Regions:
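A structural boundary/capping signal
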Residues: 1-146
Length: 146
């Protein structure tokens, strides 16, 4: 996985989120769960030997009851922290890649410092996620059109 690949993924995300003709930060709101899983599945399709983990943050951004999902992708001995809906919190962010880390503990620490809140691994995606991709896309489209 390299920067060019991540830029391609980012453009796919933006295409979906901008389909409702709303500002990106508005379309990204309330779509982190489905978008994170959808993007994780795209990456898993392209790189079947990597590990795709969903990290869940609770009470993030100093807000009670505000939760958020991001990806921790392990490729070889490197972890990539990716937020497919980063724009809901940071309108002007140019990149979905938050950081590269050496281990999961450092990923959790970064997420806690960046977003605050309590972070944990909520699930690990496998090839079974491919069956739900269309469903997640539909939920995202419904969310951004409402």
């Amino acid at each position: 996985m390299n920067n060019d690949y991540l830029k391609t993924v980012q453009e796919k995300i933006k295409k979906i989120l901008k389909s409702a003709d709303k500002a990106l930060f508005l379309s990204a709101q309330d779509n982190c769960s489905e978008m994170t899983r959808l993007v994780g599945c795209w990456i898993l399709q392209d790189f079947p030997t990597i590990n795709v983990n969903i990290l869940k943050g609770e009470n993030i951004m100093d807000a009670t009851n505000k939760n958020h999902d991001i990806l921790a992708i392990k490729e070889k001995n490197k972890f990539y922290l990716i937020d497919p809906t980063i724009w809901q919190f940071f309108k002007n962010k140019k990149n979905i890649l938050l950081a590269k880390k050496d281990n999961m503990e450092n990923c959790m620490e970064f997420a806690k410092q960046f977003y605050k809140g309590k972070w944990s691994i909520s699930e690990t995606l496998d090839k079974n996620c491919f069956q739900k991709m269309k469903e997640w896309e539909e939920v995202i489209k419904i969310n951004i059109c409402s």
